């Protein structure tokens, strides 16, 4: 919300006349690979999500709308606790409206082989590592740098166990689910091609780009 300069949480802002969250929810609703959807939101938004997202748009696969936590990893863990009788979980940012059924399919084929995979795309920009003073420390080879997206897909037992383990430690600096699995299990995680269009809407400029994607 801060970077968007809005009092409304970014996933509830509208593009194309519908909340940003609607588009990814619709995709998972349509995919035959997805059995259940668990929607994690702020405690004060549960009622809104139930009536204005789930019921309004007929998202019948939503089996639970639950409260998240202060940090992203708290919310992911809350969602994992709601899962029942599942082999795999897709963890997706509600502010990424352009996930596709093809991505869901690619992720499923990968996770069946590896138990852990994440969507991403090779970086189009040169990336620099900085020292604490703001000077360039190193330039990684762009050929091996990927920008990571969601969904991130894991076998349920693997991701649940990794979160159970890391919650006993200092989680400062944990930025995504793959990092939790890397640190706590040592599992190799496969990179699966997502899409350059699979952006996370964070700033007003992103909103304008998303509107353009919907038009064209």
Regions found by a protein language model. Give the residues of each.
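N-terminal glycine-rich phosphate-binding loop and ensuing alpha1 helix
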Residues: 1-46
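Acidic helix N-cap motif at the loop->helix transition within catalytic regions
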Residues: 47-53
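Residues at the starts of beta-strands that form the adenosine-phosphate
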Residues: 35-37, 115-116, 188
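Short, flexible, basic/aromatic active-site loop/helix in glycosyltransferases
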Residues: 129-152
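Short helix-capping segments at alpha-helix termini
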Residues: 31-33, 54-62, 85
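Conserved beta-loop-beta/alpha segment of the NTase-like Rossmann-fold superfamily
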Residues: 64, 70-130, 149
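Conserved alpha/beta core of the MobA/IspD/sugar-nucleotide pyrophosphorylase nucleotidyltransferase superfamily
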Residues: 146-216
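Short beta-strand-to-turn element immediately C-terminal to the catalytic PLP-Schiff-base lysine
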Residues: 15, 128-131, 192, 201-202
């Amino acid at each position: 919300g801060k970077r968007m300069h809005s009092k409304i949480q970014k996933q509830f802002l509208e593009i194309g006349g519908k909340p940003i969250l609607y588009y990814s929810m619709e995709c998972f609703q349509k995919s035959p690979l997805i059995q259940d959807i668990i929607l994690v939101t702020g405690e004060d938004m549960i009622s809104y999500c139930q009536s204005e997202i789930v019921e309004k748009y007929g998202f019948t696969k939503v089996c639970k709308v639950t409260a998240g936590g202060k940090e992203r990893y708290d919310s992911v863990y809350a969602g994992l606790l709601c899962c029942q009788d599942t082999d795999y979980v897709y963890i997706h940012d509600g502010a990424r409206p352009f996930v596709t059924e093809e991505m869901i399919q690619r992720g499923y084929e990968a996770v069946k082989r590896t138990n852990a995979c994440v969507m991403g795309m090779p970086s189009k920009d040169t990336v620099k590592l900085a020292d604490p003073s703001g000077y360039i420390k190193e330039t990684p080879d762009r050929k091996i740098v990927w920008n990571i997206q969601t969904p991130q897909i894991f076998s349920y037992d693997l991701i649940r166990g990794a979160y159970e383990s890391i919650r006993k430690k200092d989680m400062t600096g944990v930025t995504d689910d793959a990092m939790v699995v890397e640190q706590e299990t040592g599992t190799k995680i496969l990179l699966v091609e997502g899409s350059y269009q699979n952006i996370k809407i964070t700033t007003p400029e992103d909103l304008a780009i998303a509107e353009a994607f919907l038009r064209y």
